[in-house]
Design a protein with these regions (language model features):
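Sec-dependent signal peptide recognition
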Residues: 1-9
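C-terminal motif of bacterial Sec signal peptides marking the signal peptidase cleavage site
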Residues: 14-16
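Bacterial signal peptide processing site
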Residues: 18-20
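Coil residues (strongly favoring Ser/Thr
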Residues: 33, 39, 72-73
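N-terminal post-signal-peptidase region of extra-cytosolic proteins
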Residues: 38-53, 80-97, 118-125, 152, ...
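Exported/periplasmic cell-wall-interacting domains
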Residues: 43, 100-102, 115-206
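Glycine-rich catalytic cores of cysteine/serine-nucleophile enzymes that process amide/ester linkages
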Residues: 58-104
Length: 206
């Protein structure tokens, strides 16, 4: 984790030009609907790439795993995602928005939990159903709680798209690969706002 922080700090300094003012709007504490459980499966720290971080793009509805390689940053893999059904920064509980952050103050994965038996009632007449895939990657999102990256059991058709209550949904198979090959506790996650442009290292992919 210390190595990643050093590398990510260097990346931020290198690509910080043109970011504009930080989002200063007030953020109310919010808890999205996530089943609370005492059953936590420890994450076996195998195949961890501590020089990797995640970028989630609201405009593109994609999750990218990126790696700092020397003075460069490269994309390793990308996955389609489903995000909050409403646009903009999250303001309060139940507003159906996904929070975004800055490169200077990114989110962090605080734990990776076995969510294979988690259920949720979406209020659509289906009742309480399995909804999270095998894993829930909980994010530290200051001002909010209950936000994470998870699967899309019984909602696979929503990916890619905008249909969640604020979390980031992946196809279950993609989530499993992300967990096994890249994700780890302490991993940096940047969620980009709808209007945010591209960093220099991102421009080479377009």
């Amino acid at each position: 984790m210390n190595l990643l922080l050093v590398l990510f700090s260097a990346l931020t300094l290198l690509f910080s030009c043109g970011n504009g003012d930080k989002n200063k709007e007030k953020q109310a504490v919010a808890t999205d609907s996530v089943m609370v459980t005492d059953s936590v499966t420890p994450y076996a720290e195998m195949q961890v790439k501590e020089n990797c971080f995640i970028v989630i793009s609201k405009p593109e509805l994609k999750l990218y795993v990126c790696e700092v390689v020397g003075t460069d940053t490269v994309r390793l893999v990308e996955y389609p995602v489903c995000m909050g059904r409403n646009l903009g920064q999250k303001q309060k509980k139940g507003d159906m928005r996904t929070p975004h952050c800055t490169w200077e103050e990114p989110f962090v994965i605080t734990e990776i939990v076995n969510a294979s038996n988690w259920s949720h009632d979406f209020g659509d007449g289906r009742g309480s159903i399995l909804a999270y895939g095998n894993w829930f990657m909980r994010l530290k999102t200051p001002g909010f709680s209950g936000i994470g990256i998870h699967g899309s059991t019984n909602n696979e058709e929503s990916v890619p798209g905008r249909a969640s209550e604020g979390c980031i949904r992946l196809h279950n198979d993609d989530l499993d690969i992300l967990k096994e090959q890249y994700a780890y506790k302490g991993m940096v996650v940047v969620i980009k706002a709808e209007e945010e442009g591209l960093k220099p290292f991102e421009q080479k992919y377009y």
